């Protein structure tokens, strides 16, 4: 089945929602009806899709009557309230928030890694955290060939991961500082938290709120989601997540330990050359390596700077970059929808 699909996009006016619409159009995703939904505040907004002007409607339980696939990206509270209502009315929900990711009955899917988990869905499929998606997509081919027992990651994440308001704050702060004007941070690192810091010309080692164990919620998302997606509950994972003053594109320095001592850098490169959804950019002699500015607007995960650890024969270092609004959100969601069609699950 594929014809006659009715697709709804919830959060259609947000950064990720806009990218979802662009991705659906770019992929020529086959459907008969597209419904755009948002909060009451954004209802009435006009959006163009494939040359046709559509009006965004206020999301309600009744909005999902007749919907086959609902792509959610309007915040966790909206997903918690409306995703079950969509499922009750027969829709399959692909949710881009953290609301259901660690629910044991909800598959958490990166199609290049665990597409088969889609068979186990009960109406809701969770899209992982942006920084998790790009990392596991890069690590899965290595894990399949050589095993994996440890992952240590430091992330360098773009401001767009915190939403449109954060991007506007980056722009306004940058302009103010260049003009030697005073700034009053209001959003970063966490809107509504006790303190706010300058993001322009700065690096903030906090993404989301701190937990009792000293890790941030973002770091714990990476740790727990990686184990779930890879079906490796005993995998050792540690993460440090940092916000940088760039608009789009997350970068990650990843250290891994595999189960064998005999793998070479060339072995790892050859695996990644053939990996779906991965582009290898790694030639130190030509200063070729991934950078976020080059990844913007592209669906792939880019990997480079692959080195064998100098002390541990089973250790490797990688640099992983991706567009956080595409593979980290919109493209992975649409990929899941495409997989549902391919597997005849919708």
UniProtKB/Swiss-Prot annotation:
Reaction(s) the record says it catalyses: L-aspartate 4-semialdehyde + phosphate + NADP(+) = 4-phospho-L-aspartate + NADPH + H(+)
Residue positions of the active site: 130 (acyl-thioester intermediate), 250 (proton acceptor)
Modified positions (Phosphoserine) in chain numbering: 98
PTM sites of type Phosphotyrosine: 146
Positions contributing to NADP(+) binding: 13-16, 41-42, 160-161, 324
One of the GO BP terms on file: isoleucine biosynthetic process
Residues where phosphate binds: 101, 221
Pathway: Amino-acid biosynthesis; L-lysine biosynthesis via DAP pathway; (S)-tetrahydrodipicolinate from L-aspartate: step 2/4; Amino-acid biosynthesis; L-methionine biosynthesis via de novo pathway; L-homoserine from L-aspartate: step 2/3; Amino-acid biosynthesis; L-threonine biosynthesis; L-threonine from L-aspartate: step 2/5
Record-listed substrate binding positions: 157, 243
Principal EC category: oxidoreductase
Enzyme Commission number(s) from the entry: 1.2.1.11
Superkingdom: Bacteria
GO molecular function: aspartate-semialdehyde dehydrogenase activity; NAD binding; NADP binding; protein dimerization activity
Keyword annotations: Amino-acid biosynthesis, Diaminopimelate biosynthesis, Lysine biosynthesis, Methionine biosynthesis, NADP, Oxidoreductase, Phosphoprotein, Threonine biosynthesis
InterPro entries in the record: Asp-semialdehyde_DH_CS, Asp_semialdehyde_DH, Asp_semialdehyde_DH_beta, NAD(P)-bd_dom_sf, Semialdehyde_DH_NAD-bd, Semialdhyde_DH_dimer_dom
Assembly behavior: Homodimer.
Record-stated family: Belongs to the aspartate-semialdehyde dehydrogenase family.
PANTHER family associated with the record: ASPARTATE-SEMIALDEHYDE DEHYDROGENASE, DEHYDROGENASE, PUTATIVE-RELATED
Annotated function: Catalyzes the NADPH-dependent formation of L-aspartate-semialdehyde (L-ASA) by the reductive dephosphorylation of L-aspartyl-4-phosphate.
Protein name: Aspartate-semialdehyde dehydrogenase
């Amino acid at each position: 089945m594929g014809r006659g699909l009715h697709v709804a996009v919830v959060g259609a006016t947000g950064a990720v929602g806009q990218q979802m619409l662009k991705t659906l159009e770019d992929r020529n995703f086959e459907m008969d009806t597209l419904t755009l939904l948002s909060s009451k505040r954004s209802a009435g907004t006009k959006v163009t899709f494939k040359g046709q002007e559509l009006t965004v409607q206020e999301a309600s339980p009744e909005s999902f009557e007749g919907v086959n696939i609902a792509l959610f990206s309007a915040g966790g509270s909206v997903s918690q309230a409306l995703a079950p209502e969509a499922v009750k009315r027969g829709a399959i929900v692909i949710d881009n928030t953290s609301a259901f990711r660690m629910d044991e009955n909800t598959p958490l899917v990166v199609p290049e890694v665990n597409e088969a988990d889609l068979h186990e869905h009960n109406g809701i499929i969770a899209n992982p955290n942006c920084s998790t998606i790009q990392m596991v997509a890069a690590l899965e081919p290595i894990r399949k060939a050589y095993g994996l027992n440890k992952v240590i990651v430091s992330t360098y994440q773009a401001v767009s991961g915190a939403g449109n308001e954060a991007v506007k704050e980056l722009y306004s702060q940058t302009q103010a500082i260049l003009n030697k004007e005073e700034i009053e941070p209001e959003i970063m690192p966490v809107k509504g938290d006790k303190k706010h810091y300058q993001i322009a010309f700065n690096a903030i080692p906090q993404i989301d709120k701190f937990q009792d164990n000293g890790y941030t919620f973002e770091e714990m998302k990476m740790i727990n989601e990686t184990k779930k997606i890879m079906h490796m509950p005993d995998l050792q994972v540690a993460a440090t997540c940092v916000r940088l003053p760039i608009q789009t594109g997350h970068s990650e320095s990843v250290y891994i330990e595999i189960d064998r001592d005999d793998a070479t850098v060339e072995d790892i490169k050859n695996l990644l050359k053939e990996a779906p959804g991965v582009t290898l950019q790694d030639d130190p002699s030509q200063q070729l390596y991934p950078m976020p500015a080059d990844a913007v607007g592209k669906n792939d995960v880019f990997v480079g700077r692959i080195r064998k650890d100098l002390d541990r024969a089973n250790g490797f270092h990688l640099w992983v970059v991706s567009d956080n609004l595409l593979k980290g959100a919109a493209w992975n969601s649409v990929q899941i929808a495409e997989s549902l069609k391919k597997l005849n699950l919708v």
